[in-house]
A protein has these predicted regions:
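Short, solvent-exposed aromatic-acidic interface loops
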Residues: 58-63, 115
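AMP-binding (ANL) adenylation modules
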Residues: 81-83
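Generic structural signal for secondary-structure transition and capping sites
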Residues: 18, 73-74, 116, 143
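Short beta-strand segments
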Residues: 17-60, 68, 74-78, 88-89
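Charged, gly/pro-rich active-site loop segments
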Residues: 4, 86-153
Length: 153
């Protein structure tokens, strides 16, 4: 088992269709964990080794949106399912953006393209950007990343 470099973290998070397991804080202080589809917003990051913000869409009155509205501290874990196994856990703050539908659609299509492919991106993008959908951006504060957890080396 070894720590990932910043470049390895960025590459790992961008690859394939790994879902993120998002943890938010419930009203009673307990945790709420759900899988999410996401992409990275690299507009304000410098270089390929920087991951930028994590972006996803959700319904404005979903449990995760309500939780973020009360307490914006979140964590997200992205892991693979193939030995020797690796993971990235990001601790950060989330911000809900109530953009116009056109902006939410732009991001929803990017997310859908990653998980459903180019042919389905438009349909899934529209489905996940309708009335009441919002954009959430997570700004990373701390990252823990390990690779080859089950390796004998």
């Amino acid at each position: 088992m070894a720590e990932m470099s910043k470049t390895e973290i960025a590459r790992f998070i961008r690859q394939g269709t790994f879902t993120g397991k998002l943890a938010t804080v419930k009203k009673d202080g307990g945790s709420h964990v759900v899988p999410i589809w996401f992409v990275l917003d690299n507009e304000n990051s410098k270089g390929r080794s920087r991951i930028g913000n994590i972006v996803f869409t959700t319904y404005s009155v979903s449990a995760k949106a309500k939780n973020i509205g009360r307490n914006n501290r979140v964590s997200i874990c992205i892991d693979d399912q193939i030995p020797p196994f690796s993971f990235v856990t990001i601790f950060g703050t989330a911000e809900i953006h109530t953009y116009k539908q056109k902006e939410v659609l732009k991001w929803a299509k990017r997310i859908a393209k990653r998980y459903m492919g180019k042919d389905e991106a438009e349909a899934y993008g529209k489905r996940n950007s309708g009335e009441g959908e919002v954009l959430v951006k997570i700004r990373p504060i701390k990252i823990i990343a390990e690779k080859d957890i089950a390796s004998w080396d």
